[in-house]
Amino acid sequence: MANIRKSHPLLKIINQSLIDLPAPSNISTWWNFGSLLGICLGLQILTGLFLAMHYTSDTLTAFSSVTHICRDVNYGWIIRYIHANGASMFFICLFLHVGRGIYYGSYNYLETWNIGIILLFAVMATAFMGYVLPWGQMSFWGATVITNLLSAIPYVGTSLVEWIWGGFSVDKATLTRFFAFHFILPFIITALVIVHLLFLHETGSNNPTGLNSNADKIPFHPYYTIKDILGFIIMFLFLMILVLFTPDMLGDPDNYTPANPLNTPPHIKPEWYFLFAYAILRSIPNKLGGVLALILSILILILMPLLHTSAQRSLMFRPIGQCLFWILVGDLFILTWIGGQPVEHPFIIIGQLASIMYFLIILVLMPLAGILENKIMKL
């Protein structure tokens, strides 16, 4: 009689995805981030569920309900801070996961890559709406500024913004619908994650060399389950250090002031994980141009497979491509820093140069490096 995990209709799927899955023998720690993202998502849904039990999505009580969670609910403070800082861990893992995909040419698995981009947009939308919920100053003004960007759309822009707001400004209707969407989106994300994995398991995982690894596969369990558990422990260690020692390090002090539509904070900025895109948005003086650049800064990932000119899949044996990749990483750090700075000299020009570099590296220099490396290989 066959083992139950191999014969049971439901356990069979889990077995083929997590236990007997043939995995390349040489995948490095960079392949840990997929499972870490799964853990982050589960953690966010769990902590979010407990927060939703005590939160009220009303402009009059939202701020005080968050205070109530921190002061009066049993371990409410730690649930709230795990949720808030868990989002930061989520984005750290997300950026490293996407970076790994770019470095090792994983974007050549088209379906997996495109679902991943949809997931990135969905997670960003969820995080943005979650930031609005505590109804502090930065929540309110962040929501006002970001939703207002849609008014740059010709002809229908203003109507679209008022439709999203549910009125003529960010108010009770906006907060209520943002809470509803913030609650439902993680479950949609979970469904998309399953599709993401489904497409990945059609082709099997990529590996650092970018070569076909069918001749050398090992079972996922116990090798990579143990490796993933080590990753979980390290991530939880970092998360708990953040939560227990400096829970407000990544937040904004302005969010401890209740939302006031009559008082604008001196520097409106989103959470740190959106700052690179925010810097690109601000570097273009035209409103519509800025919005398009903001969207393109993420949508550019769709073009990755089309811009791949190299005969090799991975950057592992491509020194010129590697240099450009790490310059791009440095450029993203500069953009993140600029996004948090006031709009004044010299930050404006630095942001504009960094934005030009971002698009130049991805659209022009990386494809040219691929062509050049192909020619060097033939010498």
From Swiss-Prot:
Record's bilayer topology term: Multi-pass membrane protein
Subcellular location: Mitochondrion inner membrane
Binding site for heme b b562: 83, 182
Residue intervals passing through the bilayer: 33-53, 77-98, 113-133, 178-198, 226-246, 288-308, 320-340, 347-367
Cellular component annotations (GO), alphabetically ordered: mitochondrial inner membrane; respiratory chain complex III
UniProt remark on cofactor binding: Binds 2 heme b groups non-covalently.
Record-level Gene Ontology MF annotations: metal ion binding; ubiquinol-cytochrome-c reductase activity
Residue numbers binding heme b b566: 97, 196
Cofactor(s) needed by this chain: heme b
Keyword line: Electron transport, Heme, Iron, Membrane, Metal-binding, Mitochondrion, Mitochondrion inner membrane, Respiratory chain, Transmembrane, Transmembrane helix, Transport, Ubiquinone
GO BP term (any one): mitochondrial electron transport, ubiquinol to cytochrome c
Residues annotated as binding a ubiquinone: 201
Comment field (misc): Heme 1 (or BL or b562) is low-potential and absorbs at about 562 nm, and heme 2 (or BH or b566) is high-potential and absorbs at about 566 nm.
The protein's role, per its UniProt record: Component of the ubiquinol-cytochrome c reductase complex (complex III or cytochrome b-c1 complex) that is part of the mitochondrial respiratory chain. The b-c1 complex mediates electron transfer from ubiquinol to cytochrome c. Contributes to the generation of a proton gradient across the mitochondrial membrane that is then used for ATP synthesis.
Assembly mode: The cytochrome bc1 complex contains 11 subunits: 3 respiratory subunits (MT-CYB, CYC1 and UQCRFS1), 2 core proteins (UQCRC1 and UQCRC2) and 6 low-molecular weight proteins (UQCRH/QCR6, UQCRB/QCR7, UQCRQ/QCR8, UQCR10/QCR9, UQCR11/QCR10 and a cleavage product of UQCRFS1). This cytochrome bc1 complex then forms a dimer.
Name of the featured protein: Cytochrome b
Organism this protein belongs to: Myospalax psilurus
Gene (UniProt): MT-CYB
